[in-house]
């Protein structure tokens, strides 16, 4: 497809600067959202050309194209745009880590300081005592020891 060289160079510069470019699958859009002076069709066709040469990887989801530069694409665009090797796409740059100090949680256990009022005594009230309930669990074990109770579980309502 014929397109002005200025459009192609602007698309390649943006792609090299960002490392990725996104375009909606709308061939009739008057302009691309990031590149206001360039039609969306020119962006799609330029990226399809790079994809056919193996310089970008293409993903398509939800009516949007996503193109990512490959290592070969970085070298090719660097030579096409006459850029020095020190300049790299922003996807390859490591984010600057700020040395911010995170507040440490207060010592009070894994649940935080709000649960410090709950002690083992509060929790022990919910636990069963080893012999305090009056039920002999060991004596009820065996065939025929338990009572069989039939209750209706299926059907249309309860019949008494």
From Swiss-Prot:
GO cellular component: cytosolic ribosome; cytosolic small ribosomal subunit; nucleus
Location in the cell: Cytoplasm
Region (Disordered): 88-160
One Pfam family it belongs to: S10_plectin
GO molecular function terms attached to this record: RNA binding; structural constituent of ribosome
Family indicated by similarity: Belongs to the eukaryotic ribosomal protein eS10 family.
Name this polypeptide is given: Small ribosomal subunit protein eS10B
Source organism of the structure: Drosophila melanogaster (Fruit fly)
Lineage, highest ranks first: Eukaryota, Metazoa, Ecdysozoa, Arthropoda, Hexapoda
């Amino acid at each position: 497809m014929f397109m002005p060289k200025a459009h192609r160079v602007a698309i390649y510069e943006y792609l090299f600067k960002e490392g990725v470019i996104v375009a909606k699958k709308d061939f009739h859009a008057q302009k691309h959202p990031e590149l206001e002076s360039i039609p969306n069709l020119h962006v799609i066709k330029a990226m399809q050309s790079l994809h056919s040469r193996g310089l970008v990887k293409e993903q398509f989801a939800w009516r949007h194209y996503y193109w990512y530069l490959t290592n070969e694409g970085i070298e090719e665009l660097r030579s096409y745009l006459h850029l020095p090797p020190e300049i790299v796409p922003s996807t390859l740059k490591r984010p600057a880590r700020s040395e911010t100090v995170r507040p440490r949680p207060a010592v009070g256990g894994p649940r935080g300081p709000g649960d410090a009022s709950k002690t083992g005594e509060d929790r022990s009230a919910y636990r069963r005592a080893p012999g305090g309930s009056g039920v002999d669990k060991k004596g009820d074990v065996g065939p025929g020891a338990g009572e069989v109770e039939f209750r209706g579980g299926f059907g249309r309502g309860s019949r008494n």
